[in-house]
Swiss-Prot record:
Organism field: Arabidopsis thaliana (Mouse-ear cress)
Enzyme Commission number(s) from the entry: 2.3.2.27
Signal peptide: none
Subunit structure: Interacts with MED25 and UBC11.
Family in the record: Belongs to the RING-type zinc finger family.
Annotated stretches, region: Disordered: 1-58, 73-95, 155-179, 221-329, 400-433, 457-491
Disruption phenotype: No visible phenotype under normal growth conditions, but the double mutant plants mbr1-1 and mbr2-1 show delayed flowering.
Impact after mutating H642A: Unable to promote MED25 degradation
Compositional bias ranges of the Polar residues kind: 1-14, 23-35, 42-58, 73-88, 258-268, 286-303, 414-433
Name of this protein: E3 ubiquitin-protein ligase MBR2
Annotated GO MF terms: ubiquitin protein ligase activity; zinc ion binding
Residue stretches of biased makeup (Low complexity): 221-239
Classification of source organism: Eukaryota, Viridiplantae, Streptophyta, Embryophyta, Tracheophyta
GO biological process: flower development; proteasome-mediated ubiquitin-dependent protein catabolic process; protein ubiquitination; vegetative to reproductive phase transition of meristem
């Protein structure tokens, strides 16, 4: 859907009346060639006494390149994306040294050091680039925003010029600002690539006005402060005072001195720097207050501070009551920054929505280097899309509560704000797991120690909170992280070793306790044996074993002199008995033949006598039956044998072969 083509011009006049700046903008526009134009209404900025008057503009001018965008910070802007203001009324305003414009308006007044804030759903500026050459409209080329400051009047110029012309007068018209209410709702839309422009980043000037290295990255928004050259025709200061030049892509608030908002009680200011290299280094003191704030320049900074706002820059909601009470400001002094931190570029791995850089764009390695004296700040943005409307509860505590002076501060946000502490010593962001960097809350250069300890898988290094940190330590976080990892491993190893030692000691203690119990029982038994010996009681062999358990084994190994006497003859075999008899020898216990014949009874065997003794057994010595007329001998036990057989037996043993009793008594 296209409307009629529009042509028009707009001018802005800035004057001082009664000590207060008054800004006005006249615009005559007719809409043409704008997608779904929506009328943007701008209220009259009438404020109380002592407050600056703001200008408003509703011009719709077609521009070919992205310049100012009040849309979503994560959206990629095409050639038709311009100053996007959906008419939403918020309480945040764009602050300056007495000038500014309220959100919901497309007017712009930047005579001096500025505080910029967006007005869309994300409340951030997506692409803001001041002091750059760019094409605006059809066939027109401007030298960017020319800011002049005079003692009696201030003007903001962005007039249409050719490449050879530059603005030089004390006043100029405000032109080339286009606004469109068509918002890019689809994230990840590819942005238009321009010659000398990094993908979704800053423009490269053709006249060398911005010759210092611009921090660039491949993300949907950016924030950079660059130092223009001293001889740039775009930077003109009639009063001889240094004027700031800001290049803003992330829409974060950048200020060197800002007034409190007329309608917001809370003001959050980001660090700002004057960008004139001819002036001595100066610093900015940061002020975070509840009802109002003033930023004072107190601490020295070495040089300009280019700010890099990576990933999806989200708005920081500043809410509160409409009353503008005077609160007690909390001044935060930024310590001396490191001088040896070089520029780094955000590549395609910096965000899940980031795309690779085009071939015609500037690569991260082709970008000009930042001055070695320029510290680099990195601000991870919040991934949340809707701004949090809770009040901020800032508390600023040092790493050491008892430390005073210029010690590094550790501001921490309250639970309702969801904003982590601002660390004073920036360090590098490791490329590992950079897709999760967007989860870090806004206004946090790096997550605090509490969040680091809560997320163990995080790749961001821990920042020290002690009194001071040297530049070498800040420049080499990888070595410190590796050393800390090794120290943690060493501590864990020592802890495990101590636990093992503790378990070993516990086991040893139990064994010693058991040994002590056994020894106590042994001592008691020895005492009982000794007392029994004193009483003269008969002691058993076990009683003697109490004194020494080895006594029994020694006694078993001793030579037994009566071993042969203790032989178990009854259980021996016949062979063993023969061997034993041969070894022992013959022991004659028998009787002589004369004694046997004299004492032993003899008679003849007859068959009549055999009939009466039918149960008569044969001779036990020779095992033969008795025959008629054989000589038989009768022993004292009554057993009968052949006389020749029994006489030989009795000569060996005086024992009865049957009953083993004494055969003959002499």
């Amino acid at each position: 859907m296209q409307g009629p083509r529009s042509t028009g011009d707009s001018s802005t006049g800035i004057n001082y009346a009664d000590g207060e700046p008054i800004c006005s903008t006249n615009s005559e526009t007719t809409s043409n060639n704008i997608l779904n134009p929506v009328d943007v209404q701008f209220p009259n900025n009438t404020t109380g006494s002592g407050r600056p008057t703001y200008a408003s503009s509703s011009s719709h001018v077609v521009q070919n390149h992205n310049w100012w965008s009040f849309g979503e910070s994560s959206s990629r802007l095409g050639p038709s994306d311009h100053l996007n203001s959906n008419g939403s009324k918020t309480d945040r305003q764009l602050l300056s040294d007495g000038y500014g414009f309220e959100e919901g308006q497309s007017g712009m007044l930047l005579p001096g050091e500025s505080f910029l804030r967006g007005s869309s759903s994300s409340h951030m500026l997506s692409h803001v680039n001041l002091g750059k050459d760019m094409d605006i409209g059809s066939g027109l080329q401007t030298s960017g925003v020319v800011i002049r400051h005079n003692n009696c009047e201030t003007s903001l110029g962005s007039s249409s010029q050719t490449a050879e012309e530059r603005s030089s007068g004390p006043g100029s018209s405000l032109g080339g600002l286009g606004s469109s209410c068509k918002r890019k709702a689809l994230e990840g839309a590819p942005s238009h690539s321009f010659p000398g422009e990094s993908h979704g980043c800053f423009f490269q000037t053709e006249n060398g006005a911005w010759n210092e290295g611009l921090a660039q990255y491949d993300a949907s928004s950016s924030l950079s402060l660059s130092m223009p050259s001293q001889n740039s025709p775009n930077v003109n200061n009639q009063s001889g005072l240094p004027e700031p030049r800001f290049g803003l892509g992330g829409g974060r608030a950048v200020t060197a001195s800002a007034f409190p908002s007329t309608r917001s009680t809370e003001t959050i200011s980001r660090p700002g720097r004057r960008l004139n290299p001819g002036q001595p280094p100066e610093s900015v003191a940061f002020s975070f207050t509840q009802s109002g704030s003033s930023v004072r320049q107190q601490q020295q900074l070495p040089a300009t501070s280019p700010f890099v706002d990576p990933l999806d820059a989200r708005a920081i909601p500043v809410t509160g009551s409409s009353s503008s009470g005077d609160g007690q400001p909390s001044m935060i002094h930024l310590p001396a920054l490191t001088r040896n931190i070089h520029q780094f570029a955000w590549s395609a791995s910096s965000s899940s929505r980031a795309n690779s850089m085009p071939e015609e764009g500037l690569s991260p390695w082709d970008a000009p280097r930042i001055n070695s004296e320029q510290p680099v700040f990195t601000t991870p943005a919040n991934e949340t899309r809707n701004p949090v409307q809770d009040q901020f509860c800032w508390s600023f505590t040092r790493g050491n509560p008892s430390t005073s002076g210029d010690s590094p501060f550790v501001p921490r946000a309250g639970s309702s704000s969801g904003i982590h502490g601002l660390q004073p010593n920036p360090t590098w962001v490791t490329p590992h797991n950079q897709s999760r960097i967007s989860e870090v809350a806004p206004w946090s250069l790096f997550p605090s120690i509490e969040s680091e300890s809560a997320t163990h898988g995080a790749s961001l290094p821990l920042l020290p909170t002690g009194p001071s940190v040297s530049s070498n330590e800040a420049a080499a976080p990888s070595g410190s992280s590796s050393r800390s990892h090794r120290s943690r491993q060493r501590r864990s190893g020592l802890l495990l070793e101590r636990q093992n030692d503790h378990l070993h000691l516990r086991h040893l203690g139990r064994s010693l306790a058991a040994d002590n119990d056994g020894r106590n029982r042994l001592i008691s038994e020895i005492r009982q044996v000794l007392s029994a010996m004193r009483r003269g009681e008969n002691l058993r062999f076990e009683d003697y074993m109490v004194f020494d358990p080895l006594i029994y084994q020694g006694m078993a190994e001793m030579h037994d002199r009566h071993r042969d006497m203790r032989l178990d003859v009854d259980n021996m075999s016949y062979e063993e008995l023969l061997a034993l008899g041969e070894r022992i020898g013959d022991v004659s216990t028998g009787l002589s033949e004369e004694v046997i014949l004299k004492v032993m009874k003899q008679h003849k065997h007859t068959s009549s006598a055999a009939g009466s003794h039918q149960d008569m057994e044969p001779c036990c010595v020779c095992q033969e039956e008795y025959a008629e007329g054989d000589d038989l001998g009768t022993l004292g036990c009554g057993h009968e044998f052949h006389t020749a057989c029994v006489k030989q037996w009795l000569m060996l043993k005086n024992l009865c072969p049957i009953c083993k009793t004494v055969a003959l008594s002499t």
